[in-house]
Amino acid sequence: MIVSGKEIKEAQDSLIIEKKEYPEVDFSAEENAGSIIVKTVKVCAEINTASGDIIWKHADGSKWLSQKKPELTETDVIHYNTGDEEPIINRVKTVDGERNFIQNLKAEKVRTAYRGKLFFTWKEDEEIHGLGQAEEGIYNYRGHCQYLYQHNMRIPMPVLVSTEGYGILVDCCSLMTFNDDLKDSYLFLDTVDQIDYYFMGGHTMDEIIHDYRYLTGKAQMLPKWAYGYVQSKEQYYTAKELLEIVRHYRKIGVPLDCVVQDWNTWDPGNWL
């Protein structure tokens, strides 16, 4: 948990972490010259009191990850509304179909929050995976910049996993950016009251996902057909055409579990 020097908001509700009774964890803490060391049976965090850097270590003292001092920059949180006016709506055609745009929105400051940055130092051959579903086809995010925002087929998740055997779950529901280049490696958080993240240490990816599920709750599995091949096209013009698609896949022996009648099939103006 990282704050700006003000009061820690321990009681704030999380939209990510499951609300349940968590058992107490045995740990030890000691303060040496210039550092505080917190240990459990599996993980050790060494905090530099002067710089704010954190080194995450295995129980045997070998290093997992180095985190440099984070940044918190104060920012205004702005909401937009029409006040007492009736909304003036313009219907505009976009590449994603027709959209409603309200023309008479007014900006209103509702509170002050922070923009945050978590800086990390990865090992040279370390790979970083996760961050949800994107459209660029990036497997290993090392050397890449990835904007994490919700849109259509973009489904970001504030969690990453490393081939070094750990994961980072950031308790953040705002826009985020992952960046790794020659200058800096960081996670940018657009709007937070404080930075809360969970270090999930393990020996295998399964152990990391176990910890992730423990913190966020059990996810319901989709029906089996949803894991097969899904055929989607902007428009099928007739039922005959759609059925011929299915017959063709059956003929060539390619499993097909779902055919999507996409947006050009739907009634104009009745979808978002």
List each model region and its residues:
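A short, structure-level motif marking secondary-structure boundaries and short turns
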Residues: 229-232, 270-272
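N-terminal accessory segment at the very beginning of proteins
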Residues: 1-225, 231-241, 245-247, 261
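Acidic/aromatic-lined carbohydrate-recognition and catalytic surfaces
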Residues: 261-272
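Loop/turn elements at helix/coil->beta-strand transitions in domains of secreted/extracellular proteins
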Residues: 222-226, 252-257
